A protein has these predicted regions:
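Extracellular glycan-recognition regions
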Residues: 20-133
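Bacterial Sec-dependent N-terminal signal peptides
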Residues: 1-21
Length: 133
């Protein structure tokens, strides 16, 4: 089963526009402060948390909060993601996750003072791709 993961590493607001309701989703690494208001999820994310596995950077983490729903087969998702990006590597986006060794995360990431489209593909080890917006 694949899990659609909605998560971030910055203050995050996500608005769902499909039949899936936020109230039916679940937390992994639940943040200390979050709320659902008017079909939008807002959270304050734990600093220095992330998803990354075994690479030449020398660390593995699987500790950022994310809110997810489990789907099998084909599905479609549409979300609006906003964040208060302040620190290097702050990010907000989506994750498709099978388990801790197999996932894809994509979103907007703040690197060296610039906003970037960022994607990490993980199949046992993580590989990062980034392009300036």
């Amino acid at each position: 089963m694949k899990k659609m993961i909605l998560g971030a590493l910055a203050f995050l607001s996500i608005q769902m526009t499909s039949a899936q309701t936020l109230e039916k989703m679940q937390w992994f690494n639940e943040p200390a402060k979050w709320e659902i208001n008017d079909k939008a999820l807002s959270m304050f994310v734990t600093p220095q948390s992330d998803y990354w596995r075994i690479s030449h950077y020398g660390f593995t983490v699987d500790d950022a909060p994310f809110y997810y729903a489990t789907y099998g087969g084909e599905f479609e998702v549409k979300v609006k993601v906003t964040g208060e990006y302040k620190a290097r590597f702050d990010q907000a986006g989506l994750m498709l996750r099978i388990d801790h060794e197999n996932y894809i995360k994509a979103g907007i990431e703040f690197v060296d003072g610039k906003f970037n489209l960022s994607t990490v593909v993980t199949h046992k080890t993580s590989d990062w791709s980034v392009i300036s917006l």
